[in-house]
């Protein structure tokens, strides 16, 4: 299975599919869409207005990986369900944390 992240020199780019108003804040695993692109399924309880769901997503990812939320930023998908996050840090370490997170 493809992994929903790509390692760079000093960061990782993580593909996300976010469901706002999802009942709880959670990471529901990785999936692949019809085009073969992998993404991390996530949901937050926050409503999708004025960037609230994006902020909740960044907090969820940072907390799940045990990193500062300032290390996580939204690269694309501000108003879309599919998003790309940039996570600053050691790519090898982040890759291991993401592998552990997915089980």
UniProtKB/Swiss-Prot annotation:
| Annotated Pfam families | DUF167
Protein family per UniProt: Belongs to the UPF0235 family.
HAMAP family for the chain: UPF0235 (MF_00634)
In terms of NCBIfam families, this protein maps to: DUF167 family protein (TIGR00251), PRK01310.1 (NF002348)
Q: What is this protein called?
A: UPF0235 protein Rleg2_3707
Species this chain originates from: Rhizobium leguminosarum bv. trifolii (strain WSM2304)
């Amino acid at each position: 299975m493809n992994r929903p992240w790509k390692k760079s020199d000093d960061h990782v780019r993580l593909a996300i599919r976010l469901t706002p108003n999802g009942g709880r804040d959670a990471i529901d695993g990785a999936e692949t869409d019809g085009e073969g692109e992998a993404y991390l399924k996530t949901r937050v309880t926050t409503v999708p207005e004025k960037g609230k769901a994006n902020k909740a997503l960044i907090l969820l990812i940072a907390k799940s990986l045990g990193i500062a939320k300032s290390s996580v930023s939204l690269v694309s998908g501000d108003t879309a369900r599919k998003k790309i996050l940039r996570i600053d840090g050691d790519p090898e370490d982040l890759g291991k944390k993401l592998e552990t997170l997915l089980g």
